[in-house]
Amino acid sequence: MTEITAALVKELREKSGAGMMDCKKALIETNGDIEAAIDWLRAKGISKADKKSGRTAAEGLVAIAGAGHKAVVVELNSETDFVARNDAFQELVRGIAEVALSTDGTVEAISAATYPASGKPVADTIKDAIATIGENMTLRRAAKLEVEHGVVATYIHNAAGDGIGKLGVLVALKSVGDKAVLTSIGRQVAMHIAATNPLAIRAEEVDAAVAERERNVFIEQSRESGKPEAIIEKMVEGRMRKFFEEVALLSQAFVINPDLTVGAAIKEAEKTAGAAIEVVGMARLLLGEGVEKEEADFAAEVAAVAKG
């Protein structure tokens, strides 16, 4: 039987990223064969990852990659903020964003794409990271914007490092105007989107079901006034106009200069850019948005650990 030396364990640990005791056991099980031990650890790691995959991942990071005419934003969730501060996790989410640039920007396409550092699909690379880092992780959402002429401006809020943070925004500006001007106004609009979370770019693009729900609420509220139906209809129309102004990007008061709407601010920028500017897309990913975090019972958690 091959002697399992400290140097052999160290080599396996460096190659696999697994713990020392796991590496030693793997080498014993495979009679000191490094490659076989890596496979053994991978099998064990996949098993551990599968057990962890049922746990809620609501922390993590949002990452942005790209500039110029295209950019992507991705959300990689973890179970704890502690792991999100881990260098390996941060490198992983940045790498996934870079990979996403060469895809159509859907989670499915990104998951199937090859992660250069591992030579494996992104989905498998995440699974390996689950086994190594020890928490469930989920590539939850992604968005990609691209323009033939113009820029896709980006903004990260609460940045945890270069291109990573808790909130990421993309905004696509179609224009043949000056790129520096487009990038500047684009970043300002992206910051505005981060702050206000508009439902659509233009009023007519607001989801019909959302608008109808608001209209019904306004009708019921207005009827409580006891006024005639003709008056109620005018009241509702007025409130709907205000609603659209508040939720559509171009009609919102610009956070950088509240005296202007976003649309008016873009019109002003056109003078410097030397060409028309059209907002043709936006994406806003807030970390953990819509994910219900588990409220763990401490006593039950301790009992679960005690049971192994």
From Swiss-Prot:
Gene name per UniProt: tsf
GO molecular function, one term: translation elongation factor activity
HAMAP family: EF_Ts
Location of region: Involved in Mg(2+) ion dislocation from EF-Tu: 80-83
Function: Associates with the EF-Tu.GDP complex and induces the exchange of GDP to GTP. It remains bound to the aminoacyl-tRNA.EF-Tu.GTP complex up to the GTP hydrolysis stage on the ribosome.
Family: Belongs to the EF-Ts family.
One Gene Ontology CC term in the entry: cytoplasm
InterPro entries linked to this entry: EF-Ts_dimer_sf (IPR036402), Transl_elong_EFTs/EF1B (IPR001816), Transl_elong_EFTs/EF1B_dimer (IPR014039), Transl_elong_Ts_CS (IPR018101), UBA-like_sf (IPR009060)
Protein name according to UniProt: Elongation factor Ts
Subcellular location: Cytoplasm
Keywords tagged on the record: Cytoplasm, Elongation factor, Protein biosynthesis
Phylogenetic classification of the source organism: Bacteria, Pseudomonadati, Pseudomonadota, Alphaproteobacteria, Hyphomicrobiales
